Each structure stands twice: as structure tokens, then as C-alpha cells.
Design a protein with these regions (language model features):
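Conserved small/polar residues in nucleotide/adenosyl-binding loops
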Residues: 169-172
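Long, charged, mostly alpha-helical binding arms that flank functional sites
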Residues: 2-167
């Protein structure tokens, strides 16, 4: 890309980005930029970030919708969970470790990319697709349904904490 200069008229006005996409997209762009290299800025980048943000929000909404009848005081113990739910918690712990280290190193772009990958690949494309039957078809007191809800609750709670510093809408 070309360098942006106000005199060339090829700059991107943050107020325009804010008005078109909202503050969260502007924050997400700033957090997802690798400041060790030239920071890219374009309508296409903001469009992609908007799509990623929508996927993140939809994933969180799906999890929240499936926790309506869930009591956080009755979490399923990991040793009582099916392998798939324990696998998700392992992946979640890996994400936590990566995010904690990235926060310590001020590498916010690593966090945004890791959370996006986790939401799109680990959750949406794999885990949530498999556990839908447990969530929709099993009884409210089913042990396997409660196990899936426990995994969703812990995941949603963690994602909101991981992104609270970056996105206002995920403030815990």
C-alpha cells in the first residue's frame, strides 16, 4: 500500500470510521494492528474487521442464548465432562495463556487474532456445531447438556474478560 498523507488526500479519518462502523471496530482495528510493521488502514480492512466482530458477537450470542436455564452455581466438574467438553476447556486454557502473555508483552494484535481464530474455528466450525443436539434435544437436567452449558458458560465468561480491555461491548 501507499503511505497515507493528508496532503495527498488518501488518509482515513477516524471520525468517518467511527460514524460508518462504530467505536468497537475502530478499537478492534487499533488493537489488531501489528505496530512493529507499517499499520495498514483501508475500507476493506474495516469491512473484514466488521465481519470478524459480527462472528464474535454471534458466537457469544449463541452461547448466551443457550445459558438461559443454566445455574452457574451448578458447574459440571471437568472430570465428569465428556471428552469433547474437556477438549474445549483445554483449548480455552491455551487461549488464556496466549492472551495473558500477549497482554504482558503489549502484543494486542496476537490476542485479537487468537480470539478470532478460537471463535471461528474452535467454537463455531467445530464445537458448537457438534453440541447443538445436546443443547436443543436433551432435557434441561441432562448431565451431558449441563456439561455443554458449563463449557459454554466458562468460555463466554473468559472471552468477555479477555476482550474487556479492548472492546467496550465485552466489558465484564
Amino acid at each position: 500500500g501507499k503511505a497515507m498523507h493528508k496532503s495527498l488526500g488518501n488518509g482515513v479519518d477516524p471520525a468517518d470510521v467511527f460514524n460508518e462502523n462504530g467505536a468497537d471496530i475502530l478499537r478492534l482495528w487499533a488493537a489488531s494492528a501489528d505496530y512493529h510493521a507499517d499499520v495498514r488502514c483501508s475500507k476493506e480492512i474495516f469491512k473484514q474487521l466488521s465481519q470478524n466482530y459480527l462472528k464474535f458477537r454471534n458466537t457469544c450470542k449463541f452461547m448466551l442464548d443457550n445459558l438461559v436455564d443454566f445455574d452457574p452455581e451448578k458447574l459440571t466438574k471437568p472430570e465428569d465432562m465428556p471428552v469433547l467438553d474437556r477438549w474445549l476447556l483445554t483449548k480455552l486454557n491455551e487461549l488464556i495463556e496466549k492472551a495473558e502473555q500477549s497482554y504482558c508483552d503489549y502484543e494486542f494484535h496476537i490476542i485479537t487474532h487468537a480470539v478470532n481464530d478460537f471463535c471461528v474455528n474452535t467454537l463455531s466450525s467445530f464445537y458448537l456445531d457438534i453440541v447443538k443436539d445436546r443443547l436443543y434435544c436433551e432435557g434441561a437436567e441432562s448431565a451431558t447438556r449441563r456439561s455443554a452449558q458449563t463449557a459454554l458458560y466458562l468460555t463466554l465468561h473468559t472471552l468477555s474478560k479477555l476482550f474487556a480491555c479492548l472492546l467496550y461491548t465485552s466489558d465484564a
